[in-house]
């Protein structure tokens, strides 16, 4: 009805606009008579707008009498032809109009507006009830509404229009931001979930119209709210929607502060909506209690569509409420086929009264996800029920923090194992926090092992208190389980069993994700390193399927670098989690080095590691060179701390890391040659060293057998020569195989010409042609469609051609686009994969061929050795190897230490059969590990240092020698368990010295001591051992028995007189070898003569009578230099081992400038003089009885040494060993020939001196002065040389004294020995003259016995004239 034909005058219309608002469009205006009390009527004007009706007075100025929204209408009754009664929520309005047509017009307008605002809904449904007499009138209206073309719905089903209408109905302000968010964000995401958190910033009242619109909206099917407290008004509106909407399917109100009354009202709302489509209900985190859930349960049984997803976790349920719920679920026949997700976690369900829940689970059902975590329900009872009802579909089973009711002495219920062995779909099993004894754990693992239906199972056994019993079960089962791809055994107290467990885990070929965190917290340092080494071997295994490793929250500190150093060359791990280990900036530095060469890692998690700005900068520098890492979450804990101390550097480094990660997501750059160079550097260098060693041995045999007759020998020689040529050519095997067929696939200047590139280029041209044709056809189709839709416009002349011509430029694609996509993106991906496969094949072929060469060379070596044995000749010494190694040494220095000589001998004595493909692979794996940085030596951990204190000062077995120090595995490593035992396997062997009769010299020396000392064997001369008590260290001793046994072979060939002379030296006093603080950076080096090695590996003895050279005393810096202590031989170690009880240690956490020092206690001069006088008397007595010859052979003469006072009040002893420059023992060839007999004598002397001797007392000074604090070394490993392992910390109060090796003194020397005041220089030279040969052996022992816990020691030495030379008597 237009305004011109309206019955309402224009003046009144203007007045009405002034009342209701001029912005509101008036659609219908009718004069009506409003019936009031009885038959009384009043003239009014009915004004209809798009969503509201107004009743105003019919006079000017008009006045608003009544208004109502169309949504308030509860019913319309038209019983009389011109009467219309409108019922609303507040009142009932009866109006009389001029004609029935006016009534129909009003109703038609209201229905049309409702249909336009709420498309998809019938106006009759919105108005609840429409009654018209006769009924044909309503039918005609319905036909009118249906015939009207419904305009296209707006975004999200026209939500914005509905929201505006609802705001008008409820009287709330219309928020344009709500309309924008829905029309833009929700439309873009194409989501059907209305999330109240998106509008949580608004007032709670503003949420009411948003929710109310869902009653009519047909787009949204899910209403969700999480962690948002909902007011009462909002809850009421939600209940209204539930009770009226048949479109809402999912209701998620998690942690919304709802109580029992809401659950009861929700049950009532469901009861009022028989057509409800609700099938997902999530009320987790709301204390609904048993009453509320019981009310809901009744309606769950009546839901027309059944329940698919039910989450009632943390709703304060008890077993009573769960049983009620289970009964209702069982009562609904649809539930068995519809319910797929059931979550009752977080409710206390302990006890046995859960029969209804077990019965429900035992019925055949379709549950896929079952969560009963943290309920304390019976694990075995649940599995028994699942066995009967949930085998077919159950995929996710979360039973963490439940209780296994198995008791000791009783068998595990068979149903427990049967469930895991019979399940058809299990993918994730979570039993974390459930205390599992070995029996149920074994049943679980065996059940999974024998289930061939399951694949890719994730098993979470974290915090199950498995401990040793569980570890043993895992060791016995895990290797054979084929269907576990993810295993979490963190926080299980497996510290003592991890070493063995990891070995068994490495045998499993299905585990791709492994979590071991929180199992190292209570682990001793001596047990930690073997575990990490085994873990490194596991991830380095070529066949290892492991892709993800987690060591989170293990508090490994710097020990985690053992794992990090293995990441650089690792090719299997794609994700590593080392967070919570406190590795510090040094760990970040090592991680940075690994990331620079790693091309496999995609995710690294490294928070909670005490990283500062410097560590972040190191990682940023490394990320610049890494193009493959994609995900490295910002370490929030460390970053927040670093930002407080150094914000600029930290922010800059973090920004760079994020930029490089973004670059890695966008770029396809792959350093193809980097992986090849890494493979070449590791494999080729390691393999070639092994081939070179065996080639040297074969070449020695070739040289010796070249002139021998015999066809067989000559044929073997020719075969060996051919093998040697192959071995030489194998050096270039990998490069030639990798580059075969031309250059690499991609160079620095881009792609090189190759068949693949040519094919891609031709393909690009073909694709471009096809694309152009498709685009032209598309343009033609568009223009045709436009002509069909707008034919009148398109009839104009030339418009079609103009449109096609104008669109041609816009629809074309640059010709280089397809080519760039194919060549620079897809092509690079293809070539990268080809390069990766090519390197894999080349490495495989090279490895197999080298294995064959090694095997052939080994057989050839054995054949040539057999020819020697048949000819009755001794095998020549492989001096060529030593000469070759010696020629390489002068690059660094021109002399070889005793330690290095022993190492050369050890390599010589390796049997050729040890050089096998297996040992080669071990060497390669060791080479792939980055050595531990020397920087760690500067750090000291007192707890770790104390763990290295030996209980017995005895020799560990020889085969374990240097297992930790050597990186290349020439000899297969022993099980790490043996390294934990501090007991020697020959401990109970009888001591040799107790079976021998003392010689005359020994008896003479023994007569001097007191009778008490003779009886108990524990007390010697009064002054013996005083200084050693305060100066000598007690350290862990490595085995040297192999050398003493070799020395014994010389004893068997010597005469009886020589035997007696050696025995006399065994009973004499010992010379305490004192060392000075040398200024040299390396320990003293001893030149050795070349002798044929003993079959038992005896150490070559140095010549006694070789030239002496004074060495410069050195001042050790606390940060860079090391002090080497001279140790006692094995014989004395064994005799003294049981007397030594404790070893004291001191903390070295102070600054390096205040270095700790070992020193000799400064004693009073009177006591020294008395001790010296007594010693001289004993020496004179011995000389008279034994004669000059015996005296010259006896080592009972006292030796004096000068001491240098240290800062701490102790004395630092000086030592001036001779340093001959010729490695064969003499400076000239003439001297070399003359020294040979003396060299033999020296060898025999050393052999005899290393035999066991009886223990001697160690007396303490009555009033000792304060000793300098001992130096405690700081870190287990060095980076310079694997052999330079310093001493372990020891007590200054216990000393082990070595027997003395001296040359025969001259008369002047003997006179000098009795002199009361020797000069300092003569004194030091005497020590040097008599002890340098002994020191060579002792120095090597010192090297082998040094603990892995030691680091550099440093101290200040006084070079000023304040140094005071003291006299001491050492016996």
From Swiss-Prot:
Domain of life: Eukaryota
Biological processes per GO annotation: actin filament network formation; actin filament organization; barbed-end actin filament uncapping; cell migration; lamellipodium assembly; macropinocytosis; negative regulation of barbed-end actin filament capping; positive regulation of actin filament polymerization
Gene that this sequence comes from: CARMIL1
GO cellular component: cell leading edge; cytosol; extracellular exosome; filamentous actin; lamellipodium; macropinosome; nuclear speck; plasma membrane
Protein family per UniProt: Belongs to the CARMIL family.
Composition skew (Low complexity), residue ranges: 1244-1265
Annotated keywords: Acetylation, Cell membrane, Cell projection, Coiled coil, Cytoplasm, Cytoskeleton, Leucine-rich repeat, Membrane, Phosphoprotein, Repeat
InterPro entries registered for this protein in UniProt: CARMIL_C, CARMIL_PH, Leu-rich_rpt, LRR_dom_sf, PH-like_dom_sf, PP1-Reg/Actin-Interact_Protein
Subunit structure: Homodimer. Interacts (via C-terminus) with heterodimer capping protein (CP); this interaction uncaps barbed ends capped by CP, enhances barbed-end actin polymerization and promotes lamellipodial formation and cell migration. Interacts with heterodimer capping protein (CP). Interacts with MYO1E. Interacts with TRIO.
Organism name: Homo sapiens
Positions of modified residues (Phosphoserine): 122, 968, 1067, 1094, 1280, 1288, 1291, 1315, 1324, 1331, 1360
Composition-biased stretches (Basic and acidic residues): 977-986, 1036-1061, 1106-1130, 1139-1148, 1231-1243, 1340-1353
Name listed for the protein in its UniProt record: F-actin-uncapping protein LRRC16A
Phosphothreonine: modified positions: 916, 1228
Entry's free-text remark on domains: The C-terminus is necessary for localization to the cell membrane.
Molecular function terms, GO-annotated: protein-containing complex binding
Residue ranges with Polar residues bias: 1190-1199, 1313-1326
Pfam families documented for this protein: Carm_PH, CARMIL_C, LRR_6
Residue numbers spanned by region Disordered: 957-1000, 1036-1159, 1172-1371
UniProt repeat feature LRR, residue ranges: 245-269, 275-298, 304-327, 336-363, 391-418, 423-447, 481-506, 543-566, 570-593, 654-678, 958-981
Region described as Necessary for localization at the cell membrane: 1055-1089
Task of the protein: Cell membrane-cytoskeleton-associated protein that plays a role in the regulation of actin polymerization at the barbed end of actin filaments. Prevents F-actin heterodimeric capping protein (CP) activity at the leading edges of migrating cells, and hence generates uncapped barbed ends and enhances actin polymerization, however, seems unable to nucleate filaments. Plays a role in lamellipodial protrusion formations and cell migration.
